[in-house]
Amino acid sequence: NGHEIAHHGLYHEPSYGDTVEEQLEIIDKSQEIFKRIIGKPAAGFRCTGGLCEEAEEVLYNDPNTLYTCQGESSELPVFMEVKGKKTHTVRISCRQEVDDYIQMVYNAYPPIPAGLPRISAYEDVLSNFKDEGDGTLRFGGVLSTAFHPQVSGSPGKSKILDQLLAYITSKPEIWCTSCEEVASYWQKKGGAANV
């Protein structure tokens, strides 16, 4: 209760299949699992691999797909377009600067420094997250994070999340909410021109 659920597919696969049917089958199976466990389909789709245009057309016109977090980084949400037509699905960028996987996972390539793996200093990661939040406040926009239980769930790394949440909630000017609420707001306003 209180947590937002979006899905990546069944197995965090880099590809959802070679055909429209294979791709939609994986998405449908994933949604069936959510319906069985949490009683409803996931409102968001966080694509780990590419979808063919025909699968995107079905997915982003599905009333259950409120938002996606795929595509290039941007400060404001946009409506997804497929074949030149705007869909109701809102794309909310999940920027790499605030993705725990990008910031904290063991990195063998590129080896930085050469010959050694890298795990970022926790204080640096927290500072990066805060700086992105401050910049978003200064210039405006939406900042969507990504936290993976297998990354941020360790005892030491969980402190980063605790401290970041304390920092965010200490600022009354931040609307701290779910991607589902951001997408609903964006849909009601009709996009950037009306916000």
Regions found by a protein language model. Name each.
Residues H148:
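Acidic/histidine-rich, metal-coordinating catalytic segments
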Residues R91-G115:
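Glycine-rich, positively charged active-site loop/lid region within alpha/beta enzyme cores that binds
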